[in-house]
Amino acid sequence: MSLLATLGLELDRALLPASGLGWLVDYGKLPLAPAPLGPYEVLGGALEGGLPGGGEPLAGDGFSDWMTERVDFTALLPLEAPLPPGTLPPPSPAPPDLEAMASLLKKELEQMEDFFLDAPLLPPPSPPPPPPPAPSLPLPLPLPTFDLPQPPTLDTLDLLAVYCRSEAGPGDSGLTTLPVPQQPPPLAPLPSLSRPAPYPSPASTRGDRKQKKRDQNKSAALRYRQRKRAEGEALEGECQGLEARNRELRERAESVEREIQYVKDLLIEVYKARSQRTRSA
């Protein structure tokens, strides 16, 4: 309510002339509002029949108390000290110069452009080196065969023995003829040692695959022929059984047909005999 009263007083002061403002209350001479009381003090004053702050209850209804309520207008005064009359307020800070800011921004952009233009261009990245080739196993080479040299023939010894025998003559028995050494038989060449390849050659592998495929085709064709032969034999046996059943049914039908014909002939004879009897009677 105090705020409404203050606004009303300010409005009246602004609207009324200066001569009619003598009855207004001086804000500075109003007494200060009492200090706020604690909850126990308010409760004690209410129990004793008085108002908080030692005041006495006002006469009249409860809606007219705000008209006589004391208001502290010091809380509405500005916190800053009022300026003396004739002094100007401090100048507000000047707004930033837009042209100066634009020029600074343009300079920064030019510096950045010069920096990027002066920077050396990086060479294009070199392509990655090709991966090393996979290690391949060398093909096994056959081991070389070593042929032992043949021992030299002893032709020279044979000639020496013949020469000594001719020099000695037939009557000289003091010299003994040297035995002719026997030539050793030639050594047989060693068999070549060849170890098997660690893996089959591609040609043999391809041939094995073809042979395996051919065997599979032969076995599949054989199974197909056997299955068809079994199915044909089963169908043939069923056909023979049906033919035998058909012959049996045909014989029974023929016998029934003969019986029917016999009955017909019998009925015809009975009819003829009866007609003759009626004529004679």
From Swiss-Prot:
Cross-referenced InterPro entries = bZIP, bZIP_sf
Q: Which residues form the bZIP domain?
A: 207-270
What Gene3D superfamilies does the database record attribute to this sequence?
1.20.5.170
Q: Which SMART domains match?
A: BRLZ (SM00338)
Which stretches are tagged as biased composition: Pro residues?
121-143
This entry's comment on induction and repression of expression is: Down-regulated during neuronal differentiation. Down-regulated by pro-apoptotic stimuli.
Subunit text: Binds DNA as a dimer. Interacts with PTP4A1/PRL-1. Interacts with CCND3, but not with CCND1 or CCND2. Interacts with HSPA1A or HSPA1B; the interaction protects ATF5 from degradation via proteasome-dependent and caspase-dependent processes. Interacts (via C-terminal region) with NPM1 (via C-terminal region); the interaction leads to loss of association between HSPA1A or HSPA1B and ATF5 and promotes ATF5 degradation via proteasome-dependent and caspase-dependent processes. Interacts with NLK; the interaction stabilizes ATF5 at the protein level in a kinase-independent manner.
Purpose of the protein: Transcription factor that either stimulates or represses gene transcription through binding of different DNA regulatory elements such as cAMP response element (CRE) (consensus: 5'-GTGACGT[AC][AG]-3'), ATF5-specific response element (ARE) (consensus: 5'-C[CT]TCT[CT]CCTT[AT]-3') but also the amino acid response element (AARE), present in many viral and cellular promoters. Critically involved, often in a cell type-dependent manner, in cell survival, proliferation, and differentiation. Its transcriptional activity is enhanced by CCND3 and slightly inhibited by CDK4.
Which protein are we looking at? Answer: Cyclic AMP-dependent transcription factor ATF-5
Species the sequence originates in: Rattus norvegicus
